[in-house]
Amino acid sequence: MKKKLPIIIGCCLFVYAAIFVIIMLAAFLLPSYVYGNDKLIASELNSANKIKYRRRVHDGITTVTCDKMTGMDVIWKYNTSEDVAMQMNYTFQVTSGKAKLILIQPDNTSITLTEQDSDAGENDVSDTTSSAEQQCTLNLKRGQNKIKIVCEKGTSFSLSFHIDS
């Protein structure tokens, strides 16, 4: 019995270490895998690594800034009992990296509202990287609708938005 105890303890430690490594790899690798994966973006999963991430709501205006972000985060949720269109006024500036705002409807349909790349040249197809106010229409479906910000590795951005019903 005394010979089996160290083997059992060793096996348990090995299993716990393997589980820990898998969880840590998922926590660090998953956010960088998210950007181009629409199925993951539309899922309930929220996975992001953030440095100096600040979010505040004041007088109906939501402001989100981040020095470095990789992955995705829900920045707005809205439940509606019927299909409705709402206007979103926003300023979005990516100073480093690549980011996009995605509307996720209750049936997990994802719609790209805007996408910016700090490296986009004048001839590249990308939304403007200026901080001028923009506007878009949110076509919300019955149920819970969400807006997520999705960032490639190490993206720095500032976002301010207001949604009118």
What are these regions (language model features)?
Residues 151-165:
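Edge beta-strands of jelly-roll/beta-sandwich modules across compartments, strongly enriched
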Residues 10-26:
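Hydrophobic membrane-insertion alpha-helices, especially the h-region
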